[in-house]
């Protein structure tokens, strides 16, 4: 299957907050999104982690 699951981890505190899926064939690079981190209590950059 082309769709693969991964977690999004906060860049500042390294806490894994979100689970998502993406098409690995279309999007090869790692995903980076601004999301809310409950540990930091603010919006921070989250990066894809396996």
From Swiss-Prot:
Cysteine disulfide partners in this protein: none
Molecular function as annotated in GO: structural constituent of ribosome
GO biological process: translation
Recorded coiled-coil stretches: none
SUPFAM superfamilies assigned: Zn-binding ribosomal proteins (SSF57829)
Source species, domain of life: Bacteria
Keywords: Ribonucleoprotein, Ribosomal protein
Pfam families xrefs: Ribosomal_L33
Record carries keyword Ribonucleoprotein: yes
GO CC entries: cytoplasm; ribonucleoprotein complex; ribosome
Family of this protein: Belongs to the bacterial ribosomal protein bL33 family.
Protein name: Large ribosomal subunit protein bL33A
Organism annotation: Mycoplasmopsis pulmonis (strain UAB CTIP) (Mycoplasma pulmonis)
UniProt gene name: rpmG1
């Amino acid at each position: 299957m082309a769709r693969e699951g991964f977690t999004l981890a906060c860049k500042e505190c390294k806490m894994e907050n979100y689970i998502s899926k993406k098409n690995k064939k279309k999007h090869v690079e790692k995903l980076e999104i601004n999301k809310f981190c409950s540990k930091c209590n603010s919006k921070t950059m989250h990066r894809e982690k396996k």
